[in-house]
Amino acid sequence: LRFDKLLSAMKPGDYLFIQFGHNDSKSQWPQTYVEPFTTYKAYLKVFIAEARRRGATPVLITSMHRRVFDGEGRIKNTHGDYPEAVRQVAREENVALIDLHAMSASLYEALGPEKSPLAFSANGRDATHHNNYGAYQLAQCVVTGIREAGLPLASMLTADAPRFDPARPDPVEAFSLPASPVRSNLKPRGD
């Protein structure tokens, strides 16, 4: 139903950024689980076709990692084959790809096991959902991906904005977001 509402408002020149897979990959959740190289890919292709049918530009985004480190301080892949399925669909359908899976690994590893919890909600107890700092770092990754993919949308981005390297994230200590009189900055809306 949400997608139908989105489609009803979509018009030529719009962009549809497509990123999902966190819950689809959980085989213990039968209500959301789908196989990566069959049903999941088919769903992605439906999103792409519906966007194109309306003159919009689809853009695929791989899922960001969960914050799960191995013993060497490297991020572990908890999404199985889903990121690769997205990459395959991007190639098969000739769709721009933003590899947030790869960029988030660089980001989390740069922060390390000690500082990376500062990018997540519930004071780092949540290893999936980001706080405002983490969401901002990932948003910068997406902006980088828009530029690297050569999307025409990149011309709408502020030209003097500094380039972002997820291996060199903004210092968490220096991050500030103006206070809101109605909402805490510990957890972003929609999370």
Each language-model region and where it sits:
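Alpha-helical cap/lid subdomain in secreted, periplasmic
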Residues: R2-A159, P178, L186-D191
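A short, charged, Gly/Pro-tolerant segment at domain boundaries
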Residues: T158-E173
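Mixed-charge, low-complexity intrinsically disordered regions
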Residues: E173, P181-V182
